[in-house]
Amino acid sequence: MEQRHLGRTGLRVSRIGLGTLTWGRDTDEHDAADVLKTFWEAGGTLVDTADVYGDGGAEYLLGRLIEGLVPRRDLVISTKAGSVPDPDRRFDGSRGHLLSALDASLTRLGTDYVDVWHIHAFDPGTPLEETLQALDLAVSSGRARYAGVSNFCGWQLAKAATWQLAAPGIRTRLASTQLEYSLLQRGVEREVLPAALDLGIGLLPSSPLGRGVLTAKYRNSTPPDSRGASEHLAPFVAPYLDDTASRIVDAVQTAADGLAVTPLQVALAWVRDRPGVTAPVIGARNAQQLTAALSVEALSLPDEICRALDDVSAPVHRYPDHDWSTL
């Protein structure tokens, strides 16, 4: 699998990442082992997790698998901290919480470092410089090799990255940012992606298949074994089952038919090759799903197909998102 630099750093990662959102919950150890081995054998390196996935079960399961199944040195492990199960405070970006969470992640993963450590979300209740200091301490102590953020909007990302570049002392520049990005969700193109490109921050799109909807499996009904049929994941899929999404899925299906490939391959290739994208993160629940996704490695979409998909899925950009002179 082709490797790409993560932002403006020397770290290289596979251009498709493996997500573990369902590990330890909907994906058991047997399926997770098959998925990880398939990913590794295909040349995949980037494995993304978080301390809240499966209430820590995803990290624990990944740690068990890298003990004997896949060499730790062959993987680029990314995890996240900051989300908390508190209805009154969804995110905790305090230095104390973040560093404690990182230590707990390392214990579950059975490793003394992670390759990339992300702040899971912006915490308005904590000064940003305190949150960023946790990144500096994690890297300077050797517990993390690189650092990034997740779910930061444009101004939050720009402020964080600029602080790390300009503040006095030894600071850790942001290597990456992780947000949802697909043909069904192009909101990052308004401000986040331009900021990331300008600041040399690699984008790791989550849900690049539109929460599974862009595979076209929901066109006629909800498959009983899908996330849309899962009690706790159905609300996650539901926003992308409207008429607007249906038109985009139809266009993806048409493109796939014309290229003799699958809708999954078209949707994944589109986001993988967008400017600024380092590696979309896919959440395959079994090896069969992963193999289907990895088959996109040899596919590059023709320009005319990209333009057609761009047009049908184009987000609404108004002032001041675009230069006023073009409006």
Label for each model-derived stretch:
Residues 70, 103-112, 260:
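Phosphate/pyrophosphate-binding loops at sites that engage ATP/ADP/AMP, CoA/4′-phosphopantetheine
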Residues 106-125:
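Active-site groove signature of glycoside hydrolases
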Residues 7-23, 78-90, 113, 118:
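N-terminal small/glycine-rich loop or linker at the start of catalytic domains
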Residues 18, 49, 79, 116-119, ...:
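Conserved beta-strand positions
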Residues 20-30, 84-99, 120-126:
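Active-site mouth loops of central-metabolism enzymes
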Residues 27-39, 93-109, 157-161:
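Short, acidic/polar
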Residues 1-75:
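N-terminal binding-site loop/beta-alpha segment at the start of enzyme catalytic domains
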Residues 128-312, 327:
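Beta/alpha (TIM)-barrel catalytic core signal, keyed to glycine-rich beta->alpha loops juxtaposed to Asp/Glu
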